[in-house]
Amino acid sequence: MATKKPENMSFEAAIEELDGLVDQLENGDLALDDALKKFERGISLARAGQSKLNDAEQRVSILLKNDENAELSDFNPQPE
């Protein structure tokens, strides 16, 4: 099975995979190379999740602005 790029995954799917990786790493039964690969994947998932959270926070901030006379601005997600 091909592994999806973290930036192409939903936030929920990334968190679910990250949770599974943490469980595997905490178990301590992995060879060093396997543990490093899973750690790298986990870092990628965490960064992608943080980026999605930052984008959502920006969207919420735009929607909750109190200035009724302000023009709507385009949402520009952070480049990955």
UniProtKB/Swiss-Prot annotation:
SUPFAM superfamilies, A to Z: XseB-like
Family per record: Belongs to the XseB family.
The entry's keywords: Cytoplasm, Exonuclease, Hydrolase, Nuclease
Protein name, entry field: Exodeoxyribonuclease 7 small subunit
GO annotation terms (biological process): DNA catabolic process
Domain of life: Bacteria
Subunit structure: Heterooligomer composed of large and small subunits.
EC number assigned by the record: 3.1.11.6
Broad class of enzyme this protein falls into: hydrolase
Gene3D superfamilies: Exonuclease VII, small subunit (1.10.287.1040)
Function per UniProt: Bidirectionally degrades single-stranded DNA into large acid-insoluble oligonucleotides, which are then degraded further into small acid-soluble oligonucleotides.
GO molecular function, one term: exodeoxyribonuclease VII activity
Catalytic activity field: Exonucleolytic cleavage in either 5'- to 3'- or 3'- to 5'-direction to yield nucleoside 5'-phosphates
One cellular-component annotation, GO: exodeoxyribonuclease VII complex
Pfam families named in the record: Exonuc_VII_S
Subcellular location: Cytoplasm
Organism: Vibrio atlanticus (strain LGP32)
Record-annotated membrane-spanning stretches: none
